[in-house]
Each structure stands twice: as C-alpha cells, then as structure tokens.
Amino acid sequence: MSDGSKYGWGNNRSIILMKSKDLIHWTSSRFDVAAAFPQLGDIRCAWAPQTYYDPAEKKLFVYFTIGIVGGQNKLYYSYTDEDFTKLVTEPKLLGFDPPMDHTYIDGDISLVNGTYHLFTSDNGIKHAESKSLLSGYKYVSNENCAKVGGGVEAPTLWRRFGTDKYVLMYDNFSQPNEMAFSETTDFREFKNLDRFNKGVMKAANFSGAKHGAVIWLTKDEADALAKHWNLKDY
C-alpha cells in the first residue's frame, strides 16, 4: 500500500514475502505492515526486507526498515508464520547498544566465526558487531566501508568460495545507478573493488542493478537455472 500524497516518495508501507523450492517457480504474499501494526504509530515506509533464521527460536524472521511519521527510519525485526506469508509478531528494534538516536536503514546480517556482523546504510555503509543475533550491536568504527564516492545504500555480504575473503556489495545510487564492492579478510580494513565492470567484478547481461543480494547455489541448482533461462555459459 502506498500514499504518495501523504507520505512522499518513500511511501511503500507493505512488504512482499516470496518463497520457492527451486528458485524458478515462486509464490508471493503481500503483507501490509502499517495496517497490521497500528500500535507502532503512523508508519510511512517499510523498506528493504531481508530474512534470517533464528536458531534459538527455530523460526524465520524478517528484518527491515520502518519509518514512522515524526520519527526516524530504523531497523526492526518480526517473526513470520511457518508458511512465510505474513509477519506474526510486533516488530521490535534490532538492538544497538546503546540505542541509536538517528536514522539507520538497509540492514544485512552475517554470522562469521561466532560473531554477527551487521552492515547498515548510515551516512555511508557502516559495520557493527555483536555476539547476539538481535541485540548488543556496536559499530566497530565510524569508517565508511563503501569506498566508491557518491550515495550508497543496501549492503550485502558474502564469502568467496575457498578463501577467507568477504565481499561487501552495495548500491551506489549516484548517476548512473550501479552496484559497487569492497573486500575484507578481517572486518577491519575494506579494500575498494570499484563498481561493476570498472574493476574485477563483472556484470555480463545486466546493468543499473539496485538493492542486490547474492546467495550460494549448488551445482544442480545452478544447472537447473541455466537450463530454464537458456544460459549457455555461466
């Protein structure tokens, strides 16, 4: 649901929950966050959802940005039903220690060697750590992990196969829009890999991507996708 006249350009107040058993055939459900949780206030945006599994609760949760009229945009989380069609718990703030008193959006969580790493869009791409999944996050430093100039948002992290190198991808929305990359081995120093097709990262058949994510595939999954989309070389 959106209302541009009341909430401005960033007025999407619903999220889409999608699921698939083969990454080819998908089902989706639209969930109206604002209508479901009026107790939070007048929600003006629900942005950039991601999903994570909570091993303690043995449940999936969605963490995403919520903006409330008269307030700041911050990261919240809410558990889903078993069918992954709706949120079933009131969204709570993804916990920083101490609590953050300014806007931070577009979270990405990864567990590496017993530490949870949270990257957010906060006047650049910032990096926080915690030993707990949903609380206790602290920024490691005020460093901007994005090394390409211009506006940045929507970080996502993955490990290169067979290495100790982690790639941080983010949306570099300066004109023209494109994904950009940093690389780290210690989560303290981040090396600039530049934008798609300006460095080692290549985009073969698309451009201008936004808010991307990367997941690992088995060979069987990759082969099935290549066959479905008629990809000769991948």
Predicted features by range, described:
Residues 1-234:
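Carbohydrate-active catalytic/glycan-binding domains of CAZyme proteins
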